[in-house]
Every structure is written in structure tokens, then in C-alpha cells.
């Protein structure tokens, strides 16, 4: 039976207003769907608020539980056990997810703890998590597999209410995606009422992606599912840089540096720029090439990829 969460949802809206924001309709739809026990897939443009759409539902659920406990004088002021597992395929961006969610937790005045567990996590932090997991844990598919292999995994994950798979398109159809699906299958066997939500901005096969994330072949283990479509009307201006001489193009070695001057011109004509490359080695080559061409940019531009030291990535 569906329940109302008037006080909890009002607090979410008030927090948005206090920050000068207004919640999107798709965010409200995801909150409501989660509170009704549903799972699904959020398809919305990059930067449109998918993280808050997926993370605030569990917070509202806990707020409502405390409201009910308050009527009997049993309000719990301690951080709850693990309730949300947030799986991200990109370790380099996991820290940003933690900061975004922790800001919401702090702004709402909740005792929740938000933690991070990736290959960068220190041994001291791992030891703390072994004693008690945070209320919300951001991790990777590989770290999830290690967690599930532990002798006490089922007991430690018994309080889990929600699994969020961020950037689902990055995992769909590859080995890491299969690893994630296997982990989700085990978690659902342990808790058939577990809710699962995927987030993506660039899916073309939405229904297939939903089926892989929340299979409907076993009704006993599959809750009500839905696709929530959010902001998609972003205006994109595309400009193509073409080499002046296309007879010969360096497909090996310093791929693309023949366009260095043209890229520099594009950067100088913009307020802020992200330069993406296909692989990490090309990122290193481009960073070096830009600095050699513009030494005065030292300290103004940064290199970022998953193989860099975690402190360097945080600084960038």
C-alpha cells in the first residue's frame, strides 16, 4: 500500500528552496517512486540533478520513520546502518558524488554518514568500515565484489534498502557490467524488497538497459519498475576542427597533436574547457603539448585520469 510522506518531502523542498533551487518534476517522481517501493532507471541530461533524484528518496524515508518514532518518544539520533549502496564505474569521480550527497545530508541536518570505498581508500578507513559501514557507501563494481565475498557480508548488508548504479551506460554490456549484475542478483536474493535505480544521460536502448538492471523474469524478486525521463532539451553547439592537410594523419604515437594550435585557439576563445582524449596516455601527451606551447598556463590547467595519485586528482 502506498503511503504519504508529507513532512519528509516538505523538508526536501525546503532544503532546495534554501539553496535557491527548485526541484525538477523528474526528481520528485523518483523520490515518490522510491518511497512507493519501486525500482527503475533515470534518463536525464548531464548535470540535471540525477544524483539528488536518486539519493534524497532514502533520506526522506528515514526522516518519515523518525517522525513516526517521535510520536512515541523514540527518535534515533545515531547514524543508521548501511542503507544505500552507490556503485560508480569511475573511481576518479566518486569523490564528487560523496561531496554532493554529504552536502544534502548536512543541509537536511541528518546524522547519516557518507563513505567512499575504492582502490584509493586508505587501510585505516577500510578498517573503520570493516567495524561499521557508513549509512551510504559510494563504491565501484570491483569493491562491491570484494565486499560480497566476505564471510559476514550478508549480515553487514542486511539493512540495505537501495542500490544506485551511476553511469549505467558505462557498465552495460561489458565485464564490469556483468560483475555488477551478478552482485545485484546476490543482494536481491538476500533481500527481495531491495530497490535498484540506475542513472544515465546517454542511453539509446532504454528498455534493454532497464531489463538488465532490474530483470523482470522473476516476479518474486523484481519490484515494480519504471523509466523516469528528466531534462533532455539542452542546446548543444557543435563545431568540428579539421586538419588543414588530411592526406597524412598520425594514427600512431602523438595522435592528434597536429591539431594542437587549433585546439589552443579554441581554448583561448572559451571561458572554461574540458579536453577529452580516448586513453590516458593521450591525456598525458596533450597536457605536455599544451604546456610546451603555452608555458604561462602552468597552474591554470590540470591533468585528470584514474591512474593519477588521489591527492593530485582532488587538487585538480
Task: Annotate each language-model stretch with its function.
Residues 1-18, 22-41, 45-48, 53-316:
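Helicase motor core with emphasis on the C-terminal RecA-like subdomain
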